[in-house]
Amino acid sequence: MPFFLPSNGDYMSAWIKMIEDHEAKQELKEVFNLARTPHGTVDNVMRVHSLRPSTMKGHIVLYKSVLHDETNTIPKWFQETISSYVSILNNCTYSLANHWKNAIHLIDNTEKSDAIKKALDKKKPEEVFTGKELAILKYSEKLTKNPSEMKEEDVQELKKIMFQTAKSWRPIKSYAISIMLTELLMV
């Protein structure tokens, strides 16, 4: 059974059977409860794992450890911006729709969010970002588009520009990787 999500007039589908709450057995019900949003829903990006609750649980654990870890010092609006840019690079309208909606809310400045979105759509973050933020976006771009070309120097350069400790560095690498994994799981 496919699911459809409107995104700018287009529809995205995944031809993966998804189990609804009322059909779920106990193990899946427990994992659904872990995955519930503050509104009480289970996002489709999680529900596509419903045939294999263990993968849904793994996705939830990875997601929460990256985004909600107390050592993550990256502002939430920028986390959503990174996710949006990776979604653009991967042509994933589903992921983009979700992350950009959150980014707009967190940025809370229509002029700024419009300028950011325009630059990201053109794949030119340098039009609105500089310094650490631009370095993160460029790193995420290379990791997303050309992972086999990543070199130790890429990591060291970003660490030098941005962070003093590995503890602060971990979220960026994990975040970019988790977004890519999420999008791979949607295929």
Please place each PLM-identified region on the residue numbering.
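Hydrophobic alpha-helical segments
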Residues: 2-187
